Structure formats: C-alpha cells, structure tokens
Amino acid sequence: EPDAVTIFGKTWDFHVREALRISLEENLELIYDSLAYLKENVPEVIYDAEHFFDGYKANPEYAIKTLEAAQQAGVDCIVLCDTNGGSLPYEVAEIIKKLKKKIKTPLGIHAHNDSECAVANSLIAVENGAVHVQGTINGFGERCGNANLC
C-alpha cells in the first residue's frame, strides 16, 4: 500500500480535445473521479496539472475549472506544471497570485527548463505561496531538463 501517489491530468483545453479526444466536461469528470477514488484509497494524493501554464494562457477559465475539480476531490496538493518550459518568472508569479484567491488547496510547481527558467520559476513560485517543488538531481529530465534541486 503506498503512502502517497502523484497523478497527472490535462488542463489545457487544446490537449483535452486533440490528445484525449473527449469533451471538456468529460475531462473534468475524469479528473474528479480519478482523484476522488485515489483519495479514498491512498493517504496523500498529489495532482500534477499538466501543461497548466499553457492552458491558463489559452483559456484561464477552463484551466481553473480543472484545478477546482481536483480540489473538490480532496487532493493534498495541486502542482502547476510548466510542461513545455516556456513560462517566464513574472508569468508564474502573476498566475499563482491570482490562483491563491480561488484555490485553497496547497499549490506546487513542476518546471521544465526549455527557456532556462526552471529554477527561477520554482523559486518565484515558492515566493508566491507554492509549498511543493518537483525537480531532479542536476536538472536531468526530458528535453532540456527540470528544475535542478542541487
């Protein structure tokens, strides 16, 4: 029996329609149902909101709805993912400040390093209230890597 589990879900409406090929509402149900089930069976559930920053920039209302579905399911932490690594620190700061007014579940950050901002984005996220940071030793990770925790 695991003490904790991390699962990801789609937050960008483009990916919901084009990759999953389901409706936006079906995706919200999928997020809620999956996380609620896990929360009933595992003490700690962490939700990684994949492509959150891209999704937020394209359709903030829907991206926030995906986080609200996770929050309603009772997750312990919602991790905002800069999956393509293209967000800049000022964007991360502004978005987290806005989210803190709507989302009461603790927030985290998962930053990729495509624009060489993974560490900066992680630090600015913590400065603005994130309590969970995902990264790797020496920054190793897919494409250009993730936030270097060393």
Describe every region a protein language model picked out.
Residues 48-50, 81, 110-112, 136, ...:
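Structural motif
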Residues 64, 116-119, 146:
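Glycine-rich phosphate-binding loop at the start of an alpha helix
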Residues 13-15, 86, 116, 139-144:
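Short gly/pro/ser/thr-enriched loop/turn and capping motifs at secondary-structure boundaries
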